[in-house]
Amino acid sequence: MNILIFGPPGSGKSTHSRRIVEEYGLTYISSGDLIRGEIERKSSLGLEMAAYLSRGDLIPDTIVNTLIISRLRRQRENFILDGYPRTPEQVIALENYLYDHGIRLDLALEIFIDEDTSVERISGRRICPNCGAVYHITYNPPKVPGICDVCGTKLIQRTDDREEVVRKRYRIYIKNMEPIIKFYRAKGIYVRVDGDGLIPDVWKRIKPLLDYIHEREKKRKEHE
């Protein structure tokens, strides 16, 4: 079972991706994790990408395509791809790779939330720069405001978590995803799930769909 999962900033797609990995034994491939890995290593590529993100801009397609395709070469089946493709050019790169290697996609799943929900979820995040602990000023606040419970370090707000940056990222997402959604809808594999509400409630909307696809693929392989 090969899945694409996407959604606006703060939609919970990464959280649900990890749940899908646990439930169905898929390999998780995240464009965000790959990008952050480069940034944390402070490679020349990572520094270049960090500059784009700090402005709320998308990283150029050529850079993202290289990162993702390189990772897919090590995992050709049973994967969930989080946050990619995000532009028509990335769709072309992915489709060409999948076609050349005889790989089929079973589902393009969008977890959707509105702009204000996106801003509330993202702009409220606070990160500990020392130990990496993550908090939210509303949903998961530290015991002492602004201070990490784990190590006592002053919490920070990431540059790309600021409200104005989040709104820009959201609007870029909506604009760029329109043709991508149209493409995968035409292929008959696109499904939108309402991402509003608590994580367990959203998961209840996702799981029946995945169970159906999982059983369908299981039966298909039995008859091959």
From Swiss-Prot:
Record: residues binding ATP: G10, S11, G12, K13, S14, T15, R125, V134, Y135, G197
Superkingdom in the source lineage: Archaea
Q: Name one GO cellular component term.
A: cytoplasm
Q: What EC class does the entry list? A: transferase
Q: What is known of its domains?
A: Consists of three domains, a large central CORE domain and two small peripheral domains, NMPbind and LID, which undergo movements during catalysis. The LID domain closes over the site of phosphoryl transfer upon ATP binding. Assembling and dissambling the active center during each catalytic cycle provides an effective means to prevent ATP hydrolysis. Some bacteria have evolved a zinc-coordinating structure that stabilizes the LID domain.
Positions bound to Zn(2+): C128, C131, C148, C151
Sorted alphabetically, which keywords does the UniProt record give? ATP-binding, Cytoplasm, Kinase, Metal-binding, Nucleotide biosynthesis, Nucleotide-binding, Transferase, Zinc
User: Which HAMAP family is this protein grouped with?
Assistant: Adenylate_kinase_Adk
Task performed by this protein:
Catalyzes the reversible transfer of the terminal phosphate group between ATP and AMP. Plays an important role in cellular energy homeostasis and in adenine nucleotide metabolism.
Q: What is this protein called?
A: Adenylate kinase
* Keyword set includes Transmembrane: no
| Annotated pathway | Purine metabolism; AMP biosynthesis via salvage pathway; AMP from ADP: step 1/1
* One GO BP annotation of this record: AMP salvage
Q: Where does AMP bind?
A: S31, R36, D57, L58, I59, G83, Y84, P85, R86, Q90, R158, R169
Q: Which gene encodes it?
A: adk
Q: What is its EC number?
A: 2.7.4.3
**Segments for region (LID):** 124-161
| Residue ranges, annotated region (NMP) | 30-59
